């Protein structure tokens, strides 16, 4: 049975070991891992510069400004917090469970009276701050030591402002079974239990409302870090050096890894999506939403794909007809069509992660990544008997001119179901112009509400 550890155990470990780690890891007291320019050629002298490079990379992705208020979780001796304040002019509040390290951070901060810095001893599972206190939360090499990790993540969500950024790196456990050697040299030595995998971490974050905009598996860099740390520790601490070698073996066996996540606090995912101003951001948001999209929208939105599919079925009874599901997302329309007996459905969406969810439902004969703003080259012209378009032409999404590209894929006499928000349909002049321009006629209008009060309309059109 996995041994249980407490925060008191972790605090005692770091209070006791600070001076030892300074002697070979980083003389300034930071305990981070390196992000290397060239993994194959890195040498021991490259380790500390690689740690600094990782700080610089995280900062580049953070969006910190002079207006930012940052919570640094696991601030240690305060080096990174001070560096962030120096680089950006932001305010940084650092917390750590180690009284020794917080004391070191406070002493170091006195050398920088012009910077907005404060440090205190606190646990991330019970943050002593009010809701929505910070624009950013930053953490490095810390959360694996938190034994109530989901509680900690919910606390981080609580203190972040709406659409605030949480960026962090952490150890992960890629596999579920850990060898006795892995338990001894990794988990028991560092006083923590096997944690999330790369994928389950992202899913848990999203379920809490911390939408993962960017993620990186850094396990190769962790392996190189411990290879070099083994060299650096060998002369003074041969047993520790041997443990680092064992950690490299654990990394090779996928019993240990390292990952990075950049998240955004989002309490209302629908408004978040509609408020997008550029295509790349929209794609990133849908990729972030993919794993929990169905769970979020099942009760209040499912009627839209179901009624859109039925609208097509009313005019296209042939169950073997070729159908294109545009903006297929996680496959809700495909599921609804399959439930009605259709067997030849193709999906297209611009989000890779949404399509991966759709693929697992096994209702499509083919799935393609594509953007309706451009010609869809996976198909020849006039290839489909029916096309369903849901959630594509709306606020913050595709321009109505994309309808021209879809029109080309529909057979003469084919049917096109275009489902829209009523307010978008009635207010978008470009949409009205293109609908009138294309050679088709409206056969039916199906009106309904999503999210209880949001009016929708499904237009059923036939191509001349």
Question: Model-predicted segments: where are they?
Answer:
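A short glycine-rich, Lys/Arg-flanked "PGG" loop and its adjoining helix->strand segment in the class I
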Residues: 150-165, 400-412
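N-terminal auxiliary segments of SAM/dcSAM-dependent transferases
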Residues: 1-24, 267-277
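Short, glycine-/aromatic-enriched active-site segment of Class I SAM-dependent methyltransferases
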Residues: 171-192, 417-423, 429
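A short acidic, Gly/Pro-enriched loop at the edge of an enzyme's catalytic core
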Residues: 125-136, 377-387
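A short SAM/SAH-binding and catalytic strip from SAM-dependent methyltransferases
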Residues: 136-148, 385-399
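Conserved SAM-binding loop and adjacent beta-strand
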Residues: 18-19, 23-56, 294-310
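Class I SAM-dependent methyltransferase SAM/SAH-binding core
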Residues: 71, 77-126, 324-376
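Short alpha-helix
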Residues: 193-209, 425-439, 457
């Amino acid at each position: 049975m996995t041994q249980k550890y407490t925060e008191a155990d972790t605090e005692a470990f770091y209070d006791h070991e600070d001076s030892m780690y300074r002697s070979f890891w980083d003389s300034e007291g930071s305990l981070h891992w390196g992000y290397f320019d060239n993994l194959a050629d890195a040498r021991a002298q490259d380790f500390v510069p690689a740690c600094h490079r990782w700080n610089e990379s995280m900062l580049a992705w953070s969006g910190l400004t002079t207006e930012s208020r940052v919570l640094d979780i696991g601030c240690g001796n305060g080096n990174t917090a001070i560096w962030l304040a120096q680089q950006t002019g932001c305010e940084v509040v650092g917390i750590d469970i180690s009284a020794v390290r917080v004391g070191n951070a406070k002493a170091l901060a006195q050398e920088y009276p012009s910077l907005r810095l404060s440090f205190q001893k606190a646990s991330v599972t019970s943050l002593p701050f009010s809701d929505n206190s910070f624009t950013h939360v930053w953490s490095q090499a810390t959360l694996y030591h938190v034994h109530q990790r989901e509680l900690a993540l919910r606390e981080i969500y609580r203190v972040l402002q709406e659409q605030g950024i949480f960026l962090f790196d952490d150890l992960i456990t890629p596999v579920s079974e850990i060898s006795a050697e892995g338990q001894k040299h990794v988990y028991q030595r560092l006083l923590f239990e096997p944690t999330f995998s790369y994928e389950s971490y992202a899913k848990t974050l999203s379920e809490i409302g911390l939408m993962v905009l960017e993620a990186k598996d850094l396990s190769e860099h962790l392996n190189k870090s411990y290879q070099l740390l083994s060299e650096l520790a060998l002369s003074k601490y041969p047993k520790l050096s041997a443990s680092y070698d064992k950690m490299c073996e654990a990394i090779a066996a996928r019993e240990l890894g390292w990952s990075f996540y950049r998240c955004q606090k989002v309490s209302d995912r629908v408004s978040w999506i509609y408020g997008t101003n550029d295509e790349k951001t929209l794609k990133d948001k849908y990729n972030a939403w993919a794993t929990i999209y169905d769970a979020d929208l099942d009760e209040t939105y499912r009627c839209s794909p179901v009624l859109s599919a039925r609208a097509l079925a009313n005019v296209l009874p042939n169950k073997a007809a070729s159908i294109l599901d545009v903006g297929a997302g996680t496959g809700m329309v495909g599921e609804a069509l399959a439930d009605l007996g259709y067997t030849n459905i193709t999906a297209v969406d611009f989000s890779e992660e949404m399509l991966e969810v759709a693929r697992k439902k096994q209702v499509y004969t083919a799935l393609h990544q594509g953007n309706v703003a451009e010609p869809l080259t996976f198909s020849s012209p006039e290839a489909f008997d029916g096309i369903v378009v849901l959630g594509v032409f709306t606020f913050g999404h595709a321009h109505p001119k994309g309808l021209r590209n879809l029109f080309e894929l529909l057979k003469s006499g084919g049917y096109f179901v275009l489902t829209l928000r009523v307010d978008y349909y009635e207010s978008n002049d470009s949409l009205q112009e293109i609908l009138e321009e294309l050679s088709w006629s409206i056969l039916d209008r199906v009106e309904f509400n999503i999210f209880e009060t949001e009016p929708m309309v499904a237009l059923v059109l036939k191509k001349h």
